[in-house]
């Protein structure tokens, strides 16, 4: 079950936070909101559709992008894309060297495609956590 101000999909709970924060501050905010919460990870096509529909219903202006939990982490010589909640990135994503290391969903794409932007930008965001059974 999810708290009353959160939306549910399968066993997870989701909440849109309409505060402008950097990626790191948004991730920290999610962690502070609820035990086990992170910026949203999107692990399947069906979950992507759910997230896009939830955002479309609640975010009416194109001026907002929405942080998701995906970022490029530098590990020595290697760069890898990782979800902040530790879930696996389950598709091939070749990241060319790029200073834009954090990802948003944009209204223009109906919140369906992931775009990389600078992590220091401020955007609204969505938190996700595993609900209680």
Curated annotation (Swiss-Prot):
Residues 9-128 form the C-type lectin domain. GO terms for biological process: venom-mediated platelet aggregation. The keyword Disulfide bond applies. GO terms for molecular function: toxin activity. Keywords: Disulfide bond, Hemostasis impairing toxin, Platelet aggregation activating toxin, Secreted, Toxin. Disulfide bonds join 2-13, 30-127, 102-119. It comes from Trimeresurus purpureomaculatus. This is Snaclec purpureotin subunit alpha. Expressed by the venom gland. It comes from the Eukaryota. It holds the Pfam family Lectin_C. The keyword Disulfide bond applies. Snaclec that induces platelet aggregation without any cofactor in a dose-dependent manner. Its platelet aggregation effect is blocked by echicetin, suggesting it is a GPIb-binding protein which binds to the same or a closely related GPIb site on platelets as echicetin. Homodimer (non-covalently linked) of heterodimer of alpha and beta subunits (disulfide-linked). Signal peptide: none annotated. It is found in: Secreted. The lineage of its organism: Eukaryota, Metazoa, Chordata, Craniata, Vertebrata. One of its GO terms (cellular component) is extracellular region. Belongs to the snaclec family.
């Amino acid at each position: 079950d999810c708290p009353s101000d959160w939306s549910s999909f399968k066993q997870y709970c989701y909440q849109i936070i309409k505060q402008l924060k950097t990626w790191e501050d948004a991730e920290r905010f999610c962690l502070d909101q609820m035990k086990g919460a992170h910026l949203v990870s999107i692990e399947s096509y069906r979950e992507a559709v759910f997230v896009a529909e939830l955002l479309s219903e609640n975010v009416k202006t194109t001026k907002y992008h929405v942080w998701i939990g995906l970022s490029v982490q530098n590990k020595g010589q290697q760069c890898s894309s990782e979800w902040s909640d530790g879930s696996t990135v389950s598709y091939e994503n070749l990241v060319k060297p790029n200073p834009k290391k954090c990802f948003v969903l944009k209204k223009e794409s109906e919140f369906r495609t992931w775009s990389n932007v600078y992590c220091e930008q401020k955007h609204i965001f969505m938190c996700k956590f595993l609900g209680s059974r």
